[in-house]
Amino acid sequence: MYDRVTILGAGESGEGAAKLCLGLGASCRVTDAGAVKAERKQRLLELGVDVEEGGHDREALTACDLLVKSPGVPPTAPPVQWAHEAGIEVIGELEFAARHTTGRIAAVTGTNGKTTTTGLLHHLLVTGGLDAGCAGNIGDSFAGAVAEARQRPEGDRDIWIVEASSFQLEDTVDFRPDVALLLNLTPDHLCLLYTSPSPRDIGE
């Protein structure tokens, strides 16, 4: 378990990761190179989360046991390199959530059709009477959804249908869903991926 977690990126994924951190009993700090949306910043502060915006303090950023990176932050970003140099484990929000859910995971990825397939599978499972959750790139962050589910009287969901983008998968270390659906692979987001491993390699 972790005592202190740094979350890089204060978007939907970052807020969700912060909520899960607090639910696990860890303290956390959210840092973003840009401005944090006022409403989100207020919610985080009310939860007792330390929020930094407009840049990153290297010493404070690396004063942690784990760095959880939002998918919008490239792996070559200086804060990520600082963490690596300090010997701090760096994982993505998707991986962080997967490590702390007791539910089974069905991950859906591919270039096109992810959201439709994820939504359809979730609908079929819920209609069939299963306690299924839906999260990831489809809307609610996986970490935030897991954090909320853990607070229910009945506990975590039995199964999660997770839409996973190539950017989210790029940050995984030992993410092993119970079921993985690879829909298709076509060239996309080349302006961002041309210096990175291909989506196929990331999926492997």
Where are these regions (language model features)?
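Compositionally biased, low-complexity repeat tracts
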Residues: D50-V51, A135, P199
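Active-site flanking residues adjacent to catalytic metal/cofactor-binding acidic residues
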Residues: L8, T31, G136, V162, ...
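N-terminal leader/targeting and accessory segments in enzymes
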Residues: M1-G92, F96
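Charged, amphipathic alpha-helical interaction segments
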Residues: L22-G23, T102, R200-D201
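Phosphate-binding loop of NTP-binding sites
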Residues: E59-T62, P71-S196
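Single conserved hydrophobic/aromatic residue that forms the stacking wall/gate
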Residues: Y194-P197, D201-E204
